[in-house]
């Protein structure tokens, strides 16, 4: 272990402190690295990568309300086909992301790909919606679900108090924020353990369903009442694809994955196949015991299923749902903080978010920023509406990211591509993405209008804070002072070298 005498080094153009500047913290330990390089470390193995993806995809939805697909398809067999097709569709998207991730090895995933391909303006729109609304809202919602299931045994006959639910959700987020600030290995261990727990719960449900199936409980597996309207089909796929959301999360932290060219495609392929199999079999298990009417009317399908079959052991499922949501909160925080970090590295968010803690080598400011935004959304009474308004933007941005693949083939054919996808797959994926986003937008014009307004709010922010370079001196000095102060509080510096492109 070596020490640096002084804090953080050279002054950047914006005035933040860098590695060799004399400062008040003397000495400061830093990691034993060649040239004492301060950067995010590649600590994640293939198994860690798989658990990040699986743990991020599987939240509470499959346990609580896997009903959206059934609602729009109208029949059990049609819903199972949509679940399967959605898994295949997500795997195709992940296959395209494997080429992009191995070619553009930057944290930030689709944000980084859009930045490299279409420039800063479109990339900022994606960054704004995802960082300011989608990610913190999603984390707050999953944390609230965790709280409800933890408190349910304490309040068996009524809904848990709202204040208690929100306080416990805040505690959940804060604990995981500490873990993510302390050590990436700790965060990945949490992800591993809670991913195993949720898979164990789903395998219990699947095995119980298999027993029911082999004993002749097949009366609900029909195509009766199947809805064949185009709008209904699109909405059913929209619901199914939403359940698979998270397959691209490993791309957000690719700088911390060991041997990404080898491990990224493997992790994506294994995770997508595993999740698709588990989702389809879990849904089949539910319908061996519950009718479509019971599934649509249940507040928590897995709990109703367990009460019907497991008797005195039915309490296990709510516990596993709580464990599942805790792991999902960790997955969102782990990957989302890297999106803040990636945006700041491109100069589109405050410079402090590029900083790395000098002894723990974690993006502490980015983790804390994500945590604070989630806390703010916990104070809102209508966070579910916010996430619904901009949900279509997520799929549009993923479609634009996949469009980067053929575009870069055309404009930069000499880029090194360790993986080369057949262009048939991105073209099919882009067309399907347009179908499952435009039709629901037509079906829900009011929500779409609100969502578009939220997206358009990024434009004045971009021109005021990103595109405008010659800001008043007083403003710049204020930003420098705040950045230096936060650096000293958190003991963070900017990384030494840029990511590979």
Located regions from the model:
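Hydrophobic transmembrane alpha-helices that form the core helical bundles
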Residues: 68, 90-173, 177-181, 186, ...
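Terminal cytosolic tails of multi-pass membrane transporters
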Residues: 1-43, 405-425, 446-501
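Transmembrane helix-loop boundary segments of multi-pass membrane transporters
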Residues: 70-74, 78, 154-163, 184-194, ...
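Helix-loop-helix junctions that connect adjacent transmembrane segments
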Residues: 16, 35-40, 79, 157-164, ...
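TM-loop-TM module centered on a large, flexible mid-protein loop between adjacent transmembrane helices
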Residues: 110-113, 119, 152-157, 236, ...
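Transmembrane helix-boundary motif of multi-pass solute transporters/channels
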Residues: 34, 41-144, 241, 250-251, ...
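Hydrophobic alpha-helical segments and their helix-loop junctions in multi-pass secondary transporters
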Residues: 148, 196-224, 284-288, 398-415, ...
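Transmembrane alpha-helical segments of multi-pass small-molecule transport proteins
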Residues: 82-86, 154-184, 202-205, 363-373, ...
């Amino acid at each position: 272990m070596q020490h640096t005498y002084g804090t953080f080094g050279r002054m950047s153009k914006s005035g933040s402190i860098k590695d060799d500047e004399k400062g008040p913290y003397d000495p400061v330990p830093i990691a034993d690295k060649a040239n004492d390089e301060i950067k995010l470390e590649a600590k994640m193995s293939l198994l860690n990568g798989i658990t990040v993806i699986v743990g991020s995809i599987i939240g509470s939805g499959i346990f609580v309300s896997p009903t959206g697909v059934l609602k729009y398809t109208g029949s059990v067999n049609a819903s199972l086909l949509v679940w399967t097709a959605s898994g295949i569709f997500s795997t195709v998207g992940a296959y395209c992301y494997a080429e992009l991730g191995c070619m553009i090895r930057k944290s930030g995933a689709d944000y980084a790909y859009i930045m490299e391909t279409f420039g800063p303006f479109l990339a900022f729109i994606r960054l704004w919606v995802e960082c300011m609304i989608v990610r913190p809202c999603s984390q707050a919602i999953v944390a609230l679900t965790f709280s409800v299931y933890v408190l349910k045994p304490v309040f068996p006959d009524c809904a848990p108090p709202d204040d208690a639910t929100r306080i416990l959700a805040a505690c959940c987020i804060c604990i995981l924020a500490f873990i993510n600030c302390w050590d990436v290995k700790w965060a990945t261990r949490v992800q591993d353990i809670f991913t195993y727990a949720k898979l164990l719960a789903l395998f219990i449900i699947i095995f119980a369903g298999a027993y029911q199936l082999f004993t002749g409980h097949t009366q609900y597996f029909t195509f009766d009442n199947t809805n064949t309207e185009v709008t209904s089909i699109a909405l059913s796929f929209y619901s199914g694809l939403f359940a698979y959301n998270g397959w691209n999360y490993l791309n957000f932290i690719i700088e911390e994955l060991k041997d990404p060219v080898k491990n990224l495609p493997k992790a994506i392929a294994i995770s997508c196949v595993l999740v698709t199999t588990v989702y389809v079999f879990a849904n089949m298990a539910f319908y061996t015991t519950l009718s479509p009417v019971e599934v649509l009317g249940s507040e928590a399908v897995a709990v109703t299923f367990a009460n019907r079959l497991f008797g005195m052991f039915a309490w296990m499922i709510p516990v596993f749902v709580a464990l599942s949501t805790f792991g999902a909160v960790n997955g969102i925080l782990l990957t989302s903080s890297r999106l803040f970090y990636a945006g700041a590295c491109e100069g589109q968010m405050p410079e402090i978010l590029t900083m790395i803690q000098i002894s723990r080598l974690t993006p502490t400011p980015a983790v804390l920023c994500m945590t604070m935004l989630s806390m703010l959304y916990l104070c809102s009474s209508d966070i579910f509406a916010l996430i619904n308004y901009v949900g279509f933007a997520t799929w549009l941005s993923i479609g634009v990211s996949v469009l980067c693949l053929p575009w870069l083939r055309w404009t930069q054919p000499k880029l090194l591509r360790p993986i080369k996808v057949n262009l048939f797959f991105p073209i099919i994926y882009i067309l399907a993405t347009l179908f499952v986003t435009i039709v629901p937008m037509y079906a829900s014009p009011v929500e779409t209008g609100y969502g578009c307004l939220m997206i358009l709010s990024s434009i004045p922010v971009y021109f005021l804070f990103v595109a405008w370079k010659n800001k008043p001196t007083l403003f710049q000095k204020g930003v420098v002072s705040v950045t230096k102060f936060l650096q000293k509080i958190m003991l963070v510096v900017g990384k030494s070298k840029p990511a590979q492109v």
